[in-house]
Regions:
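An alpha-beta-alpha
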Residues: 153-157
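Positively charged, low-complexity intrinsically disordered leader regions
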Residues: 1-60, 64
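Phosphate/diphosphate-binding glycine-rich loops and adjacent basic-rich segments that engage nucleotide
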Residues: 147-152
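Phosphate/diphosphate ligand-binding glycine-rich loop within oxidoreductases
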Residues: 36, 40-146
Length: 157
């Protein structure tokens, strides 16, 4: 995994230029996948997915992306992980960080994701909190860019 990886908690954490580069990468990966040539950029990497509430689309999206890019996703079900109850968020972040390359968290409270960030030694991705859902925002903006009229800019949408 690259040392350039960082937490993805809010789209505001990235500059406009960085977000546009992310959109371009998504476009290139989508094109490669259409012809069966998806690069194995995450070969051997593991994603720990912490879910405090069930989700179909978020879970499937992350699992499929990891698989197509050569990695593996580990789904920690709501009944299996009790953040801040059976063990502290700090302990959870520290232990899971030793076993995976990235943590994705879908939590009931935004503070939980921030606590994971404060204690994890690997990048943390916000998969939904009561504050925002940045991975969905990126997907929605990409879809708008992909389907916009040729004479319109993204700000016109």
């Amino acid at each position: 995994m690259s040392a350039a990886l960082r937490h993805f908690i809010d789209t505001q954490d990235f500059s406009r230029e960085e977000l546009l580069r992310i959109m371009e990468l998504i476009r290139l990966l989508k094109e490669a996948d259409k012809v069966g040539a998806c690069p194995r950029l995450l070969q051997g990497a593991s994603l720990g997915m912490i879910f405090e509430e069930p989700s179909t689309r978020t879970r499937v999206s992350f699992e499929v992306a990891m698989t197509k890019l050569g990695g593996h996703a580990l789904y920690l079900r709501p009944g299996e992980i009790h953040l801040g109850k059976r063990e502290s968020i700090r302990d959870t972040a520290e232990v899971i960080s030793r076993m995976v390359d990235v943590i994705e968290a879908r939590t009931l409270k935004h503070k939980t994701v921030l606590d994971l960030v404060a204690n994890a030694t690997v990048p943390v991705m916000n998969g939904l909190t009561d504050y925002n859902h940045p991975t969905q925002v990126v997907c929605d903006v990409f879809t708008m860019m992909e389907h916009k009229l040729p004479d319109k800019s993204l700000t016109d949408l």
